[in-house]
Structure formats: structure tokens, C-alpha cells
């Protein structure tokens, strides 16, 4: 369900300690970035479990990003930052390199005319390549949408990414033990299988 637009969201975010306002913003190798974080359910739990690591939730819609701010306050997090930069402009707004980027339950944009909006379209993958440090850095994706997952697999391969791990059933894989389940996953895990992959940029990226 889409959130009703909150016209005060951006001004509230601008007053928040952990909202990134000044760019370019310097990221570090051990920072964890999540692109299209939505309400921040997964990244907030990751930040809670790893208090000595910095996390950056990138969500372009202020109304949605405000939900992340609320989670930060509720959990008393000191290591989760919010950015409302559009994912198509990451290379213009961030300097430095990271070893980890996540996409979690991204909008699949199923209609063909919306292909360029999918977060695994070539132009977005190029942005992630720019931010990832090297071929040992990891790009993680999990989704319950099979069509989006298959599209992402094809797009990654066509754009010179290496697939390190691929499964159509995350909860019955070797990565289930470390997987942080969102409320959606917990609610539907008996009925819906979660697709998951780990990729890295190719040698010539």
C-alpha cells in the first residue's frame, strides 16, 4: 500500500541528525548501502545488530524516508543515515567506495515501458559499479518477484557482472541463518519463496 504524500516530510528530515544534507558525501569501504530502502525495515535491523558499522539508507521519496527516521528514533540507532538522492545520481553525490550494496524487495516495475526504472537496469548497475570498491565487493539482491529476479539475472550477466550465488529459495539456502527477515518475509514465508543473489562487478568494470 502506497503512503499518502506527507508535505512536511522533507522539512522534518532536514531537521534530523542522521539525514544527509551536504553532498558529495564520503562513503567508506565498510559502510553498508541499501538502495531503495523503502520504510527501512531490513537496514534498521542490520544497524541494530551491528552498532559499530555505518549504514546508509537511500530512499528518494521523503514521505517513505520519514518512516526510516521513525525507526532510527524508536531503536535509538546512532549508525544509520538517510539519503533522499535518486539512485540514478549516486556517482554525482557520493565519493569513496564501499564493499557492500543491497537491493531489498525493489519495485519490480513490471510494464515494459517502465524498464528503465527498474533498479537493475543497466544505468543503475553502472552507478553501483562506480560505488563498489573492486571485484571482491558484493552486490546483494533479494525479492519475491520472480519476473524481476529473472530480469535482474539477465541484466547483471549482460553488463559484465559475476554471479557468486543464486537461489530461488533463500529461506532454504546456506544464507538463511544470516538473513534478516522483514515483516513481509515472516508473514508470507510459508507461502512465498524469496529469490536471492550475490554478484560482483567484472574485471573490466
Curated annotation (Swiss-Prot):
Record-stated family: Belongs to the class I-like SAM-binding methyltransferase superfamily. TrmB family.
Its job: Catalyzes the formation of N(7)-methylguanine at position 46 (m7G46) in tRNA.
Enzyme class: transferase
UniProt cross-references to Gene3D superfamilies, sorted A to Z: Vaccinia Virus protein VP39
InterPro entries from the UniProt entry: SAM-dependent_MTases_sf, tRNA_(Gua-N-7)_MeTrfase_Trmb, tRNA_methyltr_TrmB_bact
Pathway stated in the Swiss-Prot or TrEMBL entry: tRNA modification; N(7)-methylguanine-tRNA biosynthesis
SUPFAM superfamilies hit by this protein: S-adenosyl-L-methionine-dependent methyltransferases
Matches recorded under PROSITE patterns: SAM_MT_TRMB
Keyword annotations from UniProtKB, A to Z: Methyltransferase, S-adenosyl-L-methionine, Transferase, tRNA processing
Catalytic activity: guanosine(46) in tRNA + S-adenosyl-L-methionine = N(7)-methylguanosine(46) in tRNA + S-adenosyl-L-homocysteine
EC assignment: 2.1.1.33
Active site: 107
Binding site for substrate: 111, 144, 182-185
Region (Interaction with RNA): 113-118
Cellular component, GO annotation: tRNA methyltransferase complex
Name of the molecule in the record: tRNA (guanine-N(7)-)-methyltransferase
GO molecular function, one term: tRNA (guanine(46)-N7)-methyltransferase activity
Binding of S-adenosyl-L-methionine, residues: 34, 59, 86, 107
